[in-house]
């Protein structure tokens, strides 16, 4: 029977866990052979309080998160950022100024809703939603082709679903706490829109006494036909080269060429015609039924479809308008993430900025202040030495046959490293001038800019130097499609 290793004080005995590793988290009441996680971490977990406005904490990462947030806060103050990248200050100031949001009122949101509802055909309406990055029926996005990583392809997947995975849309989940929370959120938004909205918005919700369940019924038709998280781990499931013509034939009530034109996708490109479906083909059958029953102007449930679009827009834009909508956003966010207190406005505004093209602008300023070229060179040298050591291990691994060793050696030789920050910073010059007094206009401009930039990648070779993580992030990743490692500047500091 395995026993718990003892920490010997005999100098002639090498301890199983060197003191320099740090024993502050070890709980010796657990047998490491049976439950190593609690053996190594339980004391730290018990002794470390979780703040009411946090849903998780990580010892090493959390320390650096807080450190970096303090540095970013300094960089975003008007007197520090205006002289370098004024758009940062404009966007962040417009987000933090809740007083102006309340003074401006709900009209910017209502204007956006009116614009969406007057787009025209179903195809134009869905395209309007997608150009502004609001969920509606499905999603189209640009990805690397898994069979030719040098080329981007247009991909099609689920979209416009307010719950995170397939299981939440199954019939037996309707009374689960997560689904009930979502229904309450939709119901709260609908009531706020009826109270504060204009005549057009009120007319959509008039008589829809159970609109939250009605919207969930619509979503469920699509949601139950997506891959489960487990199924999504199978690359074969995630790559169905159905082609643009195949999708067109399967959903006869939707003009995909008209949609593509309205959303800004060039259908003459091979990378568009070779469209890849990331869901089961039955999702397209479900989409066809939703189009007939909900989306078409003469559909029996067309008003529910409009309510679905308006609620998805409102949920996405709630943080950027008046206090009642901001409060509902916070309430629902706390329920979803298990918090009992609100995060400060700073954290939300920082997150929205980071998810915009200005996130890279903020990273550029962070690197200028906190990550020198000498630090980058030192990190590059460290990674190269680690790879060299790994190469020696490959050569001395007797359990590998020669063919496997040669393949691993070739992969190691061809691996590229991206250290600290991009060699070429992406430009946000095409982004419309942002204003400190118009947050919603800023948000909409950023969303359209991101969509336009993504579609511009179609028909061009994949930019293998593009970063999908901000350089100030405390994280790192490996991209298997291009065999590259990315180490942001944010993680290249102690204790990492």
Locate predicted features.
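Noncatalytic, helix-rich "gating/capping" subdomain that lines the substrate-entry/channel surface
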Residues: 71-381, 385, 440-444, 449-450
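Active-site-adjacent "gating/activation" loops or surface patches in catalytic cores
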Residues: 306-317, 436-496
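Structural recognition of the beta-strand scaffold that forms the well-ordered cores
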Residues: 35-39, 155, 484-488
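Secretory-pathway/luminal and periplasmic proteins that interact with or process carbohydrate-rich
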Residues: 45-47, 221-231, 388, 415-426
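Active-site-surrounding "flap" and adjacent substrate/cofactor-binding loops of secreted or lumenal enzymes
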Residues: 14-17, 31-34, 39-106
């Amino acid at each position: 029977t395995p026993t718990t290793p003892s920490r010997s004080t005999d100098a002639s005995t090498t301890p199983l866990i060197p003191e320099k590793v740090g024993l502050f988290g070890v709980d010796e009441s657990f047998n490491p052979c049976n439950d190593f996680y609690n053996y190594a971490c339980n004391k730290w977990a018990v002794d470390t309080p979780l703040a009411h406005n946090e849903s998780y904490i990580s010892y090493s990462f959390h320390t650096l998160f807080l450190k970096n947030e303090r540095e970013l806060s300094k960089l975003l103050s008007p007197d520090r950022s205006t002289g370098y990248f004024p758009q940062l200050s404009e966007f962040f100031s417009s987000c933090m100024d809740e007083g102006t949001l309340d003074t401006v009122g709900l009209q910017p949101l209502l204007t956006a809703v009116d614009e969406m509802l007057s787009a025209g055909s179903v195809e134009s309406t869905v395209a309007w939603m997608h150009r502004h990055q609001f969920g509606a029926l499905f999603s189209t996005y640009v990805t690397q082709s898994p069979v030719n990583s040098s080329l981007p392809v247009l991909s099609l997947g689920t979209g416009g679903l307010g719950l995170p995975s397939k299981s939440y849309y199954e019939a037996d989940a309707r009374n689960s706490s997560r689904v009930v929370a979502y229904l309450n959120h939709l119901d709260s938004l609908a009531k706020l829109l009826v109270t504060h909205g204009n005549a057009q918005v009120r007319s959509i919700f008039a008589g829809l006494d159970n609109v939250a369940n009605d919207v969930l019924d619509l979503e469920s038709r699509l949601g139950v036909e997506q891959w489960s998280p487990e199924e999504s781990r199978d690359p074969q499931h995630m790559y169905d080269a159905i082609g643009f013509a195949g999708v067109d034939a399967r959903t006869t009530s939707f003009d995909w060429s008209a949609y593509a034109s309205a959303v800004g996708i060039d259908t003459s490109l091979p990378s568009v015609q070779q469209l890849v479906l990331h869901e089961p083909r039955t999702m397209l059958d479900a989409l066809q039924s939703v189009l007939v029953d909900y989306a078409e102007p003469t559909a029996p449930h067309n008003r529910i479809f409009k309510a679905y679009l308006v609620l998805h827009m409102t949920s996405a834009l709630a943080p950027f308008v008046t206090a009642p909508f901001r409060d509902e956003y916070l309430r629902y966010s706390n329920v979803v993430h298990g918090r009992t207190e609100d995060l400060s406005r700073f954290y939300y505004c920082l997150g929205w900025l980071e998810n915009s093209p200005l996130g890279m602008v903020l990273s550029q300023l962070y690197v200028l202040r906190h990550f020198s070229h000498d630090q980058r060179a030192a990190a590059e040298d460290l990674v190269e030495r680690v790879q060299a050591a790994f190469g020696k291990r490959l050569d001395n691994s007797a359990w590998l046959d020669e063919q496997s060793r040669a393949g691993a050696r070739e992969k190691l030789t061809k691996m590229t490293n991206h250290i600290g920050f991009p060699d070429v910073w992406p430009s946000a010059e095409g982004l419309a001038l942002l204003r400190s007094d118009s947050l919603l206009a800023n948000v909409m401009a950023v969303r359209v800019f991101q969509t336009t930039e993504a579609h511009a990648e179609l028909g061009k070779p994949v930019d293998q130097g593009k970063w999908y993580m901000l350089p100030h992030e405390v994280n790192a990743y490996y991209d298997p499609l291009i065999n590259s490692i990315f180490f942001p500047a944010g993680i290249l500091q102690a204790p990492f």
